[in-house]
């Protein structure tokens, strides 16, 4: 079994490593964390220009079609300097859901995040969910084609900066995922930092009106999409942790 990086993977690693060493000092990171956004918008645009935001998306969705190994390479280098830009929330979690979905509007949404123009956050955790992606007290009432969203989501990574949210909810006795404008009437946010200074939010929905085109997936597809996104995110966080430990002890 060949466990060596391919030439492309090694080139990616060298590129990310060079950026992190030359452009992402600890002082730079501290300045970013003190900003209103909690990330550097110019660096995020640079990530797009370098192609990093397109790495994991399928070629038919405008990406490079790379997989978990390339994401591990990226996150291990990110971990060495504790990069705070919202790659995990926008590209890995929300991006994975969109990339693997059969949603008709996925192409435009993916283009909006790979271009660096917008952020989308995944809102699936709730009080009492215990990390079970199939759990949802949040509901979407379906009355004669009119959809009304109610509920509260916790630990929404980068939720304060997102222009759209992917929200899990129960509708007609099955789990659905819906795309929701972050400035929708009836939506409110409480933002706060996580223990590692990442931006997070608790988001409440009170009679938020949606149309049928907002539904990304239903039933087992929703659960499969969430599980896949969480699995990839877990891998990325593990690689990031290796990078952290490497920087500390080697």
What are these regions (language model features)?
Residues 138-141:
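A structural signal for short hydrophobic beta-strand segments in well-ordered beta-sheet cores
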Residues 116-127:
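A short, Trp-centered hydrophobic/proline-enriched beta-strand micro-motif
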